[in-house]
Amino acid sequence: MDNQELTMPTKYDPSAVEKDRYDYWVNGKFFEAKNDPEKEPYTVVIPPPNVTGKLHLGHAWDSTLQDIVTRMKRMQGYDVLWLPGMDHAGIATQAKVEAKLREEGKTRYDLGREKFLEETWNWKEEYADFIRSQWAKLGLGLDYSRERFTLDEGLSKAVREVFVKLYEKGLIYRGEYIINWDPATKTALSDIEVIYKDVQGAFYHMRYPLKDGSGSIEIATTRPETMLGDTAVAVHPEDERYKHLIGKTVILPITGREIPIVGDDYVDMEFGSGAVKITPAHDPNDFEIGNRHNLERILVMNEDGTMNDNALQYKGMDRFECRKQIVKDLQEEGVLFKIEEHTHSVGHSERSGAVVEPYLSTQWFVQMQPLADAAIELQKSEGKVNFVPDRFEKTYLHWMENIRDWCISRQLWWGHRIPAWYHKETGEIYVGVEAPEDAENWEQDKDVLDTWFSSALWPFSTMGWPDIDEEDFKRYYPTNVLVTGYDIIFFWVSRMIFQGIEFTGERPFKDVLIHGLIRDDQGRKMSKSLGNGVDPMDVIDKYGADSLRYFLATGSSPGQDLRFSFEKVESTWNFANKIWNASRFALMNMDGMTYEELDLSGEKSVADKWILTRLNETIETVTQLADKYEFGEVGRHLYNFIWDDFCDWYIEMAKLPLYGEDEAAKKTTRSILAYVLDQTMRLLHPFMPFLTEEIWQHLPHEGESITVAKWPEAVKEYTDTEAAADMKLLVEVIRAVRNIRSEVNTPLSKQIELYIKTSTPEIAERLEENRSYVERFTNPSLLQIGTDIQAVDKAMTAVVSGAELILPLEGLINIDEEISRLQKELDKLTKEVERVQKKLSNEGFMKKAPAHVIEEERAKEADYTAKREAVEKRIAELKN
């Protein structure tokens, strides 16, 4: 390395540090998987973000965790593939493009299918570029040579292959079922696209008269407009109130239609009246009951949410207008006898905001039970998927054990077209990877597949499957770890697992690292309606990518939610700034040392031996914790080592030899500074890639980039437990003296007398050997160390391991003045404690104040109380 580069700018400026660095990494191909047979492969596929807009903080968190894992594994000598890509996000993207067209006064039907798809591809290209620029700002070590998109030709081929194979096995079928229907976009929705909101509604209590005139049966509903499609009333067969009515007939109000009373175990005798109206075309549970009792399915709505011909005089009315009118009519007929206000959870379309309608529709489905059974069996074997934290395995298995068939068709244009064709004359269905030969006689299904269908194949379709001889598939599949949020374990993780088992015969990933959701500093979910969302790019512009990454990675444990606050990001910036300043100091004192001149074989001080011991401990701890994905704990250990051990202690102690006359000691200290900084930057690199690369490039080093530098390993001969114990005692002594100085308001510049009474001669000897450090950091005019130190009047004392420190106050401070000053401080703190306690005992405040405000007040109470006790203790010591 050119020694002239061993200087760094005075100030830490993240934008300057991060500028052009990513291009250097990408152009150097440091992130590309090398297909090196000498190295063990390690694979991660990125959860593909939707091409609908900007990445949010959740994406930044998720991808930072993956980057940490892959950077570390690359440094550990693995042939790492971190495969990037994006999801076409069917309904989400189509909704965005349609909104754009509406602004131009157009609809997709004005353009036609081909032109609309052309428009959507243009949208995709624009936003894909934007997402790549955000990946770059975050510093993600992605292999762009293998980037994939869920509508790529290769992935489309895999989708068709899977559809056909499942169809041939009887696991894909076409049939009628109740699906989530969005009347605004006129398409089926997956469960994850339905957002539940509490809505003020009502229970409408009605009496359906028995045909024989012997009475009536009471039912209640929140959707009275659906009664027009009722085809039965159900009761529990063991219900003594109603079992004699099973098989009888009631007259459906308004319509005059006769419908049966059926007995079904599904009915909860304890809920409501114990009798329920059955509308098989508008409720999933009613649909199942209808199947069991062979009931007619009467659909009373159109796809746009208006009432159809079966709704009689209400035909053409909007469903909610119909509700109002039908309530009036039922009241007039005398069958509606009570309206009970009720807040209930109602599904809304994530895209359009419309109230979702449970709707009978002919759709394509995957028969889930056989696939789920295979996934459940896998978890009983050694080849199971390991969930981190493992509690999420129960969540996963619960979903798999209670699985329903999966509706996979969507009434959209953007997506994978269903590979099914219908003969124009005979109506015969043909399913195939390619179109039938006489294509002119066939019409392809107009629907597309649910986005999750292609996403479920992501780990292997991106590797070249169904070509099982593809080099990447053979080498890099199955993958090592999937990093994702707990909110999509069912919708995505579970589907990848059962498709992986079905089509590759093995789990698609060994581990699943689950993280939580990002919330604001009050613990609320980030949302547009609350206006509390944060753009990660804004955070990067202000504090740099490294500060954001470090906060995201170390701010919580696996599976836990993360509270975002700018104050916490600022504190990580302060950490980065501390590292920068410490590195500048080290480099300024290296005197142009080259990599070849590094020499750690010289005689070492206790501080040298201690910092090397602590480095070894940190390397081992960090490596073990990172392998368990405990990045919060990794961050804590790195922070403590860098801030406390290296910056606050070792660098200060290193100034003694660096500013001294002993050239051999100087050389050893410089070498240790360079070595510890180098190893520490490597440990920190996966978390703060830009800063560590910048510092490492200024250090004496071998190699082109820290991204491919070797991961640190503990050097056994550098561990010296005796020196570590000596240093621990030294630090205790120095800290205790500093605390006493602080308590009696005496600055370090003012000399003190210091007596150290040890419990054994050995401890006295150890302290005497390191006397220069005690003198350097406590500034005594007199220092006595021994076992026979006599008691001193009017002195402050402190106890450390094996010794008592005595610091005489005579001549150091005016004791009466100090007591007076402390008394004023005590009075002030007492008032603060009383003020906070008064607030916390106020019932009105406790009822009305937000939880976080109450917590803040409780924290203040604890803080003021602790400070008051400390001042009381000091006053007592001074008086005695």
UniProtKB/Swiss-Prot annotation:
Name the reaction it catalyses.
tRNA(Val) + L-valine + ATP = L-valyl-tRNA(Val) + AMP + diphosphate
Main subcellular location: cytoplasm
Per UniProt, ATP binds at 528
**Which PROSITE patterns has this protein been placed in?**
AA_TRNA_LIGASE_I
Q: Which SUPFAM superfamilies match?
A: Anticodon-binding domain of a subclass of class I aminoacyl-tRNA synthetases (SSF47323), Nucleotidylyl transferase (SSF52374), tRNA-binding arm (SSF46589), ValRS/IleRS/LeuRS editing domain (SSF50677)
User: Motif range for 'KMSKS' region?
Assistant: 525-529
Which molecular function GO terms apply here? aminoacyl-tRNA deacylase activity; ATP binding; valine-tRNA ligase activity
Q: Name the residue ranges of motif: 'HIGH' region.
A: 49-59
An example GO BP is: valyl-tRNA aminoacylation
Q: Which CDD domains match?
A: Anticodon_Ia_Val, ValRS_core
Keyword set includes Oxidoreductase:
no
EC code(s) of this entry: 6.1.1.9
Q: Which domain of life is it from?
A: Bacteria
Write out the coiled-coil annotation as residue ranges. Answer: 809-880
Q: Where in the cell is it found?
A: Cytoplasm
**What HAMAP family has UniProt attached to this entry?**
Val_tRNA_synth_type1 (MF_02004)
Protein's job: Catalyzes the attachment of valine to tRNA(Val). As ValRS can inadvertently accommodate and process structurally similar amino acids such as threonine, to avoid such errors, it has a 'posttransfer' editing activity that hydrolyzes mischarged Thr-tRNA(Val) in a tRNA-dependent manner.
Any idea what this protein is called? Answer: Valine--tRNA ligase
Q: Which organism is it from?
A: Bacillus licheniformis (strain ATCC 14580 / DSM 13 / JCM 2505 / CCUG 7422 / NBRC 12200 / NCIMB 9375 / NCTC 10341 / NRRL NRS-1264 / Gibson 46)
Q: Name the gene.
A: valS
